[in-house]
Amino acid sequence: MDKIRNFYKEKTQLCNVAILLVMTLIGWLFFKGHYSNIMTDFGREMIFPQLMNNGNVLYKDILCIYFPLGYQFVALMYTLFGTSIFTLELCGLLVITIFVLSLYSIAANFLDNKVSLLLCLTVLIASGFNGTLFNMILPYSVGFTLGISFALLSVSLVINYFKSEKVYLLYGAFLSCGAAFAAKGELGLLLIAILYVSLCAKPCSIRQNIVNIFCFLLFPVLSLGLLMFQGITVSDIFNAAEFMRIFFTTKSMLFHIAKTGGIFTLSNIPIYLSAIFNIAIFLFASYFLFSKTIDKRTQIVAIGISAYLLNITTCWRHTMFLPILLVIGLICYRKQLSKEIIFLIISAIILNLRMFWGLILSTYGFYTAPIAILTLIVLLQSVITENKLFPTKNTFKKFVIYLLSAYCLFFAVFDITERMKNDTEFRTEKGVLYLPKSQANPINTAIKYIQSYTSVGQKILVLPEGTAINFLTDRNPDGKMPMADRLYYEAIGEEVVMKNVAEADYEMIFIAEGFGLTHFGAKYLYDDKNPVLKYIQSKYNLDWVVKDGDNIINCYVKPY
């Protein structure tokens, strides 16, 4: 035992990296395959790369609102390892590894080794293996998870450049930032923070900055070049850009952006006040419990109580004000902060602009909040002076460890509970999935019916969305309208949706309700008054309806 302890002391960084890698693999093996809500965005991430490998061109033959690198990455993995759920999960493993090791590299430059390790383990459980649509094994968007992972890698390389002055690290940072941009466009704004370093904080020569810009452009140029090689035209690019503009300014999208913190609205003030109240209760109660612990046994009990408090104080909102706090911290303490910390704060703010007015531990926050949490800890550690609450820096460190332990315990219980709900197996040629029983039964019924009465390559449509069924059955959607949820419905236009349904000549059309599908503050889209549904009912025969709880699938078949 002493040999192990001594080895850990001598090789702490190496051991911590090994621990993170082992925990990543164990968590991946334990949680993979168990998902809920696969009728939502999951399907898009499954089917688009398959369509690309079948000769369809993104933005030309496939209606897409996201940047291409994530889909190109998965398409490459399909080519290497086969088109399957396992390959998608393997992509997730690679992305999680980059994500958590990059985060650890950043943390280790500022924080105690124990804090850095515990923070990354907590993030691994809370974000990597999250029991919702916004996990990182099979996420709502590979482009987002790949992009944020490259963004964190970029930040890590810049921090290490500050320490070592090795310019190749900065080249790597610009390269990674370019990859983040090619995967998720908004993450390219990180370039502003890196330019602050190369031009001001730690200036490079003109020649080096030229290389920096070349490195940034490499992935975007290669990604776009591949599309052009496949046949995309300048006109296609402009058409795709125009559709993205329309899509992201629809009524439903603006509602969604406001709800997820992208826009400040007065209607959110009650939520802000509630969050402040709940955060205050949690922090005061947790500090009281922390201050009363006298040994490890009482500390474990106290951590368990704090983890329970996370549930009753709506912990999803505990991170709500992080971007605003970082801005305030930067303004108030900029003169006493090192250039590395200033860069870190700017980077964390930029990466959380999408949820600036309400960074919640939900949806996109699972991906972007970790860097903000890390940065806040670094900022507080730098500016907190000795006081009654924290007589020494070590007291503050212990309290951080206490809080992280509570969050880690809470999310571990949450993830395992969600996994237990996803307990109903169904098998397809693409792999095995475990879903909640109320979702698995209707989906399984639809899949078996499709496989029995259609052939591979024939077209089916699932409304409002459900391209996972297309992927699992090898029945293609129409690339020009693979889905038509409320966002796409508003962006495409009702008449065009109806025209696409008429021209695509589907063998079957499925209307789904429930399955975690969101309606963006409005009523269910495909009700009896919907013109598109009326058209489908006039041209197709309703063959069957299957319902399990709130989850319903209506099957319409082409008459013969």
Regions found by a protein language model. Name each.
Residues 15-24, 204-230, 276-284, 298-307, ...:
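Hydrophobic alpha-helical membrane-interfacial segments at the cytosolic entry of transmembrane helices
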Residues 33-48, 61-76, 83-86, 438-442:
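Extracytoplasmic catalytic/substrate-binding loops of multi-pass membrane glycan-assembly enzymes
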Residues 85, 99, 121-148, 157, ...:
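Aromatic- and kink-enriched transmembrane "portal" helix at the membrane-lumen/periplasm boundary
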Residues 90-114, 124-129, 153-156, 282-290:
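Transmembrane-helix motifs of polytopic, lipid-linked glycan transferases
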Residues 114, 146, 151-170, 199-204, ...:
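Membrane-interface transmembrane helices that cradle and orient dolichyl/undecaprenyl
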Residues 157-179, 206-217, 296-304, 338-348:
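Short hydrophobic alpha-helices at membrane interfaces in multi-pass membrane enzymes
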Residues 168-185, 191-196, 218, 222, ...:
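Membrane-interface alpha helices of multi-pass inner-membrane proteins
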Residues 416-488, 495-520, 547-556:
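Short periplasmic/luminal acceptor-recognition loop of GT-C membrane glycosyltransferases, typified by
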